Amino acid sequence: MPNSEPASLLELFNSIATQGELVRSLKAGNASKDEIDSAVKMLVSLKMSYKAAAGEDYKADCPPGNPAPTSNHGPDATEAEEDFVDPWTVQTSSAKGIDYDKLIVRFGSSKIDKELINRIERATGQRPHHFLRRGIFFSHRDMNQVLDAYENKKPFYLYTGRGPSSEAMHVGHLIPFIFTKWLQDVFNVPLVIQMTDDEKYLWKDLTLDQAYSYAVENAKDIIACGFDINKTFIFSDLDYMGMSSGFYKNVVKIQKHVTFNQVKGIFGFTDSDCIGKISFPAIQAAPSFSNSFPQIFRDRTDIQCLIPCAIDQDPYFRMTRDVAPRIGYPKPALLHSTFFPALQGAQTKMSASDPNSSIFLTDTAKQIKTKVNKHAFSGGRDTIEEHRQFGGNCDVDVSFMYLTFFLEDDDKLEQIRKDYTSGAMLTGELKKALIEVLQPLIAEHQARRKEVTDEIVKEFMTPRKLSFDFQ
């Protein structure tokens, strides 16, 4: 029986498959960010066209005319048509940004609800961080299990990281570290911070020496966030792998229990990717297990790990959670943050490789003012008259989005939202409010960073016992 679907729909289906393969090959071939972004935008556009024509989402295993397979919302679920999210690329067609409720369903995580936030407040005796109150950290895996342990006086530790791809970090990179510092303070727990200089050497056009030097420079910015030197260990993969047999043994255990087929499915690796990329996920997984750090935890294997990170890193830890029980370790818990949008809009996250999309921690007050005024996408109207009459749209306005991250005063933020939405506040006034928040925040960070000496960095990065006793 001939296929009743129009040929154009099948052609569109095949075009999506071809474009998806192009995106994967560009990533594998270390293409430029612009090339990758352009290919991803085309992929998103094709998927939207397919949905409009077919009346349903594109599914790779379901050509037009075939019944859709049972929906799978687990780790291998098909990408939602509007949003493309993996550890290297974040792209959406919506001016409002990624649909995080859909992402929770697709990734199989749990929403951070009011009940969980209240429980964190009861457990710590501290008001929840505004990142929690405002839904910036919005999703979790097993956070209730961590709180069970904490309430029963059982230890846990924090693990987060940074991929040092450039000497200068941007303000978006601060988000997990600001929140992790708060977690360390309120729970009084050890913290390990992985600098994946090996990853950046494998993925970027860098020498080993460059990747390591970026790790050290980025460590200074991380230390400037205020972490306690007696409770924090920062390590470079290039350094620590050779120092710690416990760490390397866990890497090998993970490598043995994860197949090439699995990592291809999770990360989209192709046959042209170097073997270093294929084995790297095991290195990012290893800090999730306490005996990777015998100097801190001795040989204990039962201490649970809590990982605050942006949700694009979740594929690494879905793999980690899958392998953990098979090698005798507890699954790490996770707290996921939203993405920090680029100045040009929430369709993609801020990137250090695009100076006009980013506000760097090295920027001067003048540069910050210029970037916000010139590049920050506005939710305002075309004319002052229209804006006064109809008001602005905070859902797409980047300046307002940034204020939700960095303006701690809830009442002030709500007043700005009301004034901008009603038209009482103009776009220029909203941008001015953001500039007045960002300029001192970055200046204070720069002052703290100047106080971070090479000796302080060395102490943070030296494997050692922290101020906790693990028997």
Curated annotation (Swiss-Prot):
Mutation: residue 133 to C; reported impact is: In NEDMSBA; uncertain significance; loss of function; failed to rescue both the eye and head size phenotypes in a zebrafish wars1-knockout disease model
The protein's Enzyme Commission number: 6.1.1.2
Q: Biological process GO annotation list?
A: angiogenesis; negative regulation of cell population proliferation; negative regulation of protein kinase activity; positive regulation of gene expression; positive regulation of protein-containing complex assembly; regulation of angiogenesis; translation; tryptophanyl-tRNA aminoacylation
Protein induction: By IFNG/IFN-gamma.
**Phosphoserine modification, residue list:** 351
According to its UniProt record, which reaction does this protein catalyse? tRNA(Trp) + L-tryptophan + ATP = L-tryptophyl-tRNA(Trp) + AMP + diphosphate + H(+)
Locus of motif 'HIGH' region: 164-173
Q: Which residues carry this modification: N6-succinyllysine?
A: 154
Q: How is it modified after translation?
A: Proteolytic cleavage generates 2 forms; T1-TrpRS and T2-TrpRS.
All copies of domain WHEP-TRS, residue ranges = 8-64
Question: What PANTHER family does this protein map onto?
Answer: TRYPTOPHAN--TRNA LIGASE, CYTOPLASMIC, TRYPTOPHANYL-TRNA SYNTHETASE
Q: What is this protein called?
A: Tryptophan--tRNA ligase, cytoplasmic
Q: Which organism is it from?
A: Homo sapiens (Human)
Lineage of the organism:
Eukaryota, Metazoa, Chordata, Craniata, Vertebrata
